[in-house]
Amino acid sequence: MQREAILLVFFSLLLLSSLSLSHKFSNGSSPEDEEEEEEKVNEDAGVIRRSMFPPDFIFGVSTSAYQIEGAYLEDGKGLSNWDVFTHVPGNTPNGENGDIADDHYHRYMEDIENMHKLGVDAYRFSIAWSRILPKGQFGEVNPSGIEFYNNVIDNLLLKGIEPYVTIQHYDVPQELEDRYGGWLSPQIQEDFVYYANICFKEFGDRVKNWITINEPNLISLMGYILGWFPPARCSPPFGNCSAGNSDIEPLIVVHNMLLSHAKAVHLYRKQYLAEQGGRIGVTVGPFHYEPYRDNGFSYQAVDRAYAFNFG
């Protein structure tokens, strides 16, 4: 009975819509007028249409390597800090991990086709550091990793989708964590630039938009203040990790990340920019603040909040 009532309402609305449309055209209005009126109605109702954006607005989707690739030990890939972290009981809900994830490593062609059907202009994805350099500078470049990302980039371009590539999105080769503590050591700056150079050299002829590090502020917060992300370091009152100092280590980590970013940007601009003509920057995890009251003190508080979180 409920279903019949719903169908009756639906067909009644459909009939009214048809009659209304017929009445409008019988009064001499053109299809162009109707389209403009429809857009105005949609805009008033809060409906977002592509036509409301400037012609050069870029519509895109994004992922990160650990979240979607899977194949965590296939074709020469090494362990990342996330591979190790998620295999420790209690670190994730129900022991979930990215061993398979969305299986993008094997199904990237399907994923690219789906993006093409969506009509997106750009796809931002990250390269798994441990798939390119399983042991950082302490091992060889993995040719299967290079081949995989070449295939992804080439097929994106064939579908008219611009690749936006993040060099590091939370994941670090576990080898570097074990050898010198990852982002806690200045040695990682050299490793990161070495890795970035390989990315520029192998993919830069087609990739014109680079992001060095994804959200360094959140890596610091989640991994070294709260201990919720690898390497799970923290101290009271923020958490009860087995090791870490939530007051000092985040500053060291951000310092090393910013210098790694700066050195990679310098390398790109010096050695690759003239030939490849790309752009390079960093992604910061945003927080938005509103003044509590409409007065100078509240606006100053907003400024302080932005300065504290973003520098």
Regions found by a protein language model. Name each.
Residues 1-12:
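Classical eukaryotic N-terminal signal peptides for Sec-dependent ER targeting/secretion
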Residues 129-134:
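A short, flexible beta-alpha/helix-coil linker loop
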Residues 50, 97, 101-104, 108, ...:
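Aromatic-acidic/polar surface patches that form glycan- and anion
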Residues 101-115, 188-199:
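Short, acidic/polar
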Residues 78-113:
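Aromatic- and Gly/Pro-rich amphipathic surface segment
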Residues 107-128, 162:
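Catalytic domains of carbohydrate-active enzymes, especially glycoside hydrolases
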Residues 3-5, 18-92, 135-138, 143-311:
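Active-site region of glycoside hydrolase catalytic domains
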